[in-house]
Amino acid sequence: MSDLINIQQKLLPDVLAVMQKRYQILRSIYFAEPVGRRTLAGMLGMSERVLRGEVEFLKAQGLIDIASSGMTVTKEGLIVFRDLEGIMNQLSGLHSAENRLAELLQIKKCLVVQGDSDITPWVREEMGRVAVKQLDLALVEKRNVVAVMGGSTMATFADTMPSDFAKGRELLFVPGRGGIGEDLDNQANTICDRIATKTGTKHRVLYVPEQLGEEAYQSLMKEPAIQEGLRLVQSANAIVHGIGDALTMAKRRHTSDEVIEKITRLSAVGEAFGYYFNEQGEVVHKVSTFGLQFEDLAKIPHIIVVAGGTSKAKAIKSYMKSAPENTILVTDEGAANMLLNGSKAHLK
């Protein structure tokens, strides 16, 4: 296939350019549907006149429907869109970028989706879909315990989970941390419940605050139900989690001004599992959290990290210096370009 594409690029470059353009239009309609022509033209940076001709072609081929509510992708269009993904990624250089990024970060695998989630919110949805596929490939055992962390990216991950995900497997989704006091929709408990409801699988909850003082932590740890919940979470054979911007996460946790001043002074850029990292990957602050700890990752065979957007590049870089080598990163072009163009040497 790659040889054929190389030949086509030399003999029929115009044909490939048209195919790429129509793929981008189809892709944009799929993620924004139902979408009007004016909105779509703005998203693609294309004039309405040029776009009109292209969408009429796609409609004539039965790939999209056009209604008063906007344009949507048909079942046939979705098949074509999925079939073209690999080819388009090769043409755009994404496969090469994925390999270089995995080597740079010294992790198992990187998957890069087109776009920048900072600019185009639905790129996050595509990252979620790719993460779901990677989790599906990882869960080869008959029985699996999957830990899921909280956050808006994980909420999107849950939304992209198909109803038939279990496929005969016994799956138990567990929250990687407590969550009382956090935005309900983005709590790990809520996300696990949503996934289990969609897929007809089981889930457990951790109804404790994510952050605890030492005395409260030790008191709760004496409770048998709490001990059992933590043992279950720590038995996970797969985990899906995000990476946060340091200051954003600190403010979301209602962190004191004193601690915010500290992590700012120590140049923290990324956060995961309550650990705050600077650009060199050094831990500059740690919050006592209830649930999985960073060191627990060493015992988990399958680790999928979902984080994207140009603004997250520094956070991703800082975290990956300490990430286990079996980590799979799902990101977007915005973050990938910043990481590849801004780095001259290995990160670890």
Residue ranges and their predicted role:
Residues 1-87:
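Basic, Lys/Arg-rich alpha-helical nucleic-acid-recognition elements, primarily the DNA-binding modules
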Residues 9-17, 32, 52, 76-77, ...:
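ATP/nucleoside-binding phosphotransfer catalytic cores, i.e., glycine-rich phosphate-binding loops
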Residues 47-48, 146-157, 180-181, 244-247, ...:
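Gly/Ser/Thr-rich loops at beta-strand to alpha-helix junctions
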Residues 60-142, 159, 165-166, 184:
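HTH-adjacent hinge/linker in prokaryotic transcriptional regulators
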Residues 99-109, 168-245:
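Ligand-binding beta-strand-loop-alpha-helix segment within the catalytic cores
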Residues 153-165, 251-259:
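Short Gly/Thr/Asp-enriched flexible loops that form oxyanion-binding sites at enzyme active sites
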Residues 253-282:
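Gly/Ser/Thr-rich active-site loops/lids in small-molecule metabolic enzymes
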